[in-house]
Amino acid sequence: MANVSFTFDSQEQNKELRPSRLVGRSDERNGRRQGTEQKKKEKEDSGFRVSEEGEIPLQQGSNTDSYARDDLTQQQRVSDVVMQRRSHETESRLWQRARTQDRRGSESRMMFDGRTQWSHAPVLSSAYPVRPGEDNCLFYMKNHLCEWGSECCYNHPPLQEIPCRIGKKLDCKAGACKRGSNCPFNHPKERDGDSLPMPQGRTPDLRRNDSGRRYNTESRSWPENKEKEVGQFRDHQDSKEDAQEVLLQQRPRDVEMRKRSRSPDFRAKTETKEHREAEERSSRESATATGKVSGKENELRPTYVYLLMMPENHNVDVQQTLQEQRKRNIKKARIEARLKLDQIRPTVVLENSRATKMMIEWGFTDFRKLQGSNLGNKKWICWVRKHCC
């Protein structure tokens, strides 16, 4: 304890004595400068001596000597000013060093460390402002120091929150970074997935370990993984080449078809084809509407088709006759179909004797009045339906 008290007393005495020593040195220097200035003035006045009678004697030396003296005096004055400034700067630097050493000595304390039980480590001052809403000071985050000090506008978190960050890049946790490539932090989220840069080349990566030997590492640029992609690309190229060849072969055909379509013969043929297709469609529709086609129409159909295939059908008269014949055939087919339907209808014919027996068995007696009347079969059937059914 006695040793510790002695050290603190000695430090306080040094603090009190240092400013006084510096002040004494500055006074001595100022006294020397004043003495040198007085000597210079006396030398300058010695060139011009005034007698008691008021007469000015001749100037000693020539004009060249006077000019040289003036230059020397100016140079001496400039050198004195420079030396004075340098002395002030050195004094201020020495004063600042003394103050910083005293501060470090006062702020230093014993910090416990598990590896080195007690270590004498300096603790930095908390002069930097903490602004949680602002961005972190980049220089402070890297070096734990800031040039602006308390005037800095950025955030300076305490040292406990940023351990082991000196000289290392941190992960940018702000999401989408606004600084872009100028940001000194890492961006692991943006590099995940497809945004990772693909390795170039197909050779395996060779890296050196601590012993100096090279070893293979797992890389995505092996040729085995890219054979499929290359094959797909080649197939795509082959399909494109085939399509181009087909187009080149098809172009002359298209040109020939266009030339033929402009000719009158080709137009007439196309018109006849369209006319045939329309007639065939109409005949099919009529056949489905009328039911079964008669045998006569089947007999006439080959002749009808033969007439259509003839080149003389281009005339209007032949076409009109064919249309009339077609209409007649349709009418005949309809008449025959109706007759067949009438024959297929069920007709009920009852004999009078049988009807009377049935009516007596059922208990009807009013029908005897109708027996004498001349009723037709239709009326008799209607009366039976009303009373019996």
From Swiss-Prot:
Basic and acidic residues: compositionally biased ranges: 12-52, 86-110, 204-243, 251-284
Claim: Repeat is one of the keywords in the record: yes
Bias type Polar residues, positions: 1-11
Secretion signal span: none
Disulfide linkage: none
Gene Ontology molecular function, alphabetical: DNA binding; mRNA binding; zinc ion binding
Chain intervals annotated as zinc finger (C3H1-type): 131-157, 158-190
Domain of life (superkingdom): Eukaryota
Keywords: DNA-binding, Metal-binding, Repeat, Zinc, Zinc-finger
Region (Disordered): 1-110, 183-296
Protein known as: Putative zinc finger CCCH domain-containing protein 10
Organism per entry: Arabidopsis thaliana
